[in-house]
């Protein structure tokens, strides 16, 4: 998509090969705001609970994913997968969270970047949270990030919600 996706909710299951996401496969520019996905998502390259990939000037704001993500690894492919976004290379990610587990099957001779929140990250993340089967939130990170695991002790869901709301207010969203 190159457009605007707002206030949507997706359930069920989604499967594919490349650019597989609960809401959108690839968001190239435009924005995704206020969307959620409880869908189970299965794919091979760039796989995520909300978006398989964000790119160019795409923004992701106030979104969340609760469905499980399965990455079926192709031995000859580079792999990026996360509970929220597989490959995050848009212009910003603000106040989003993910709770679905991320699992993978197989092995690859290419890179395998799998995280509890994002597979690959190439942009600024502000107030991003995850809680699932992964200790590492981002498989490969090229930018500073505000991605934090909710552990229930130091970081509770209440603290996470408060921080996401504050970030949205500060951004004027």
Model-assigned labels for residue ranges:
Residues 1-173:
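Predominantly extracellular beta-rich ligand-binding scaffolds that present long acidic/polar faces
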